[in-house]
Amino acid sequence: MAKWQELQSSNLRRCSYDIETGMLQIQFNSGKTYTYQEVPASVYNGLLEASSPGQFFNQNIKGVYE
């Protein structure tokens, strides 16, 4: 099980990433958790390093990965 990383965001609470499978899980502040498949490590790292994780999610993950 991948370790959860807290996010500083008004919409996103935390995320976890499995580098072997490319599975990214994002938990929203609402409590809902969504899973995205085949996400490159570079996208996960971008999410962690983004000054606005919510904006990064909307531009680079939402609608791009299932």
Language-model features, listed with the residues they occupy:
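Acidic/histidine-enriched, beta-strand-rich ligand/metal-binding domains
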Residues: A2-E66
